Structures are given as structure tokens and as C-alpha cells.
Regions:
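Non-catalytic cap/lid and distal C-terminal segments of serine-dependent acyl enzymes
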Residues: 1-146
Length: 146
């Protein structure tokens, strides 16, 4: 989150950054990463537009906003949704967003709660995973047709 926050702040804040992205001819990789952070903010806590869960200058957590983000975290949600449908989870062991750590915890909770799922950790990152469809789509097909 810190890199995205730095990029957004460089443009003068969320609204200025959004305006910049609307008017630029080409988005950089940093722009895309910052836009993903804005999209999460709008999705997880869109109460008053796009508001980040941290102070833009100190990166201190805004506990109220962060609690709204955490309501969408699978590790939080599983406590209230113990009857999940069968789930396929795969993640690269070198994921650049480091989601493998949270998914390992989710996998363990699913095991603890005896929720049926498939968990696969593969040699790779978050990108270039099209070949993983050869694993997930047959699994999904089987679930839908059984």
C-alpha cells in the first residue's frame, strides 16, 4: 500500500490523482498500482467516495476506515460464513502482492473448519498465470456438473 500511497500523494491526493489518470495519454505501471489502491478504497469503503484507510502523509491507520476494509477480508468473513461453497484457491509462492501469506492462513482456517476446498501454491507470481486455467477451469467444470 505504501508505494501506491506515495504515488497518489505525489499527484496531490486521491482526487488529483484520479483527474491526472483521466487526462494522461499513457498510464505507467505505478499509475496502475495506485489505481488498484483507489479501486479497493472505493469498493471496501466507498461511503464518501474514495478514501484511503491511512493518513496520506504519515501512513497511520485510520481505525474506523480500516475496520470497514477488514469486513471484506476473507479471514474476517470466514468467521461469519462457515458454510462456504467448494472453493479453489491458487497462489504463486513469490506473489508480488504477498497474498500467499493471507491465503496460507485462509487455507488453514478452511481446514480447521472442515470447509471443502482445493489449495494449490505454485512456483510463480501474481502475473503470467494464464496457464493456471488448465488447473482451475477443469476443477470448476467438475463442481458445476457433478
Amino acid at each position: 500500500m505504501a508505494d501506491g500511497l506515495t504515488h497518489i500523494t505525489k499527484h496531490g491526493g486521491v482526487q488529483s490523482f484520479i483527474e491526472y489518470t483521466k487526462n494522461t495519454n499513457k498510464l505507467s505501471s505505478d499509475d496502475i498500482q495506485a489505481l488498484m489502491l483507489c479501486a479497493m478504497a472505493a469498493s471496501y469503503d466507498g461511503v464518501d467516495g474514495i478514501s484511503l484507510p491511512v493518513d496520506p502523509h504519515s501512513c497511520d491507520i485510520d481505525e474506523e476506515r480500516w475496520s470497514r476494509w477488514m469486513q471484506w477480508d476473507p479471514l474476517t468473513m470466514i468467521e461469519d460464513h462457515r458454510t462456504w461453497p467448494k472453493t479453489f484457491i491458487d497462489v504463486g509462492d513469490k506473489d508480488q502482492y504477498h497474498i500467499q501469506y493471507g491465503l496460507r492462513k485462509l487455507h488453514q482456517k478452511l481446514l480447521d473448519y472442515e470447509i471443502e476446498h482445493t489449495y494449490e501454491e505454485f512456483d510463480g507470481t501474481h502475473s503470467g498465470v494464464e496457464y493456471r486455467m488448465d488447473f482451475s477451469l477443469p476443477w470448476l467444470y467438475t463442481q458445476l456438473t457433478d
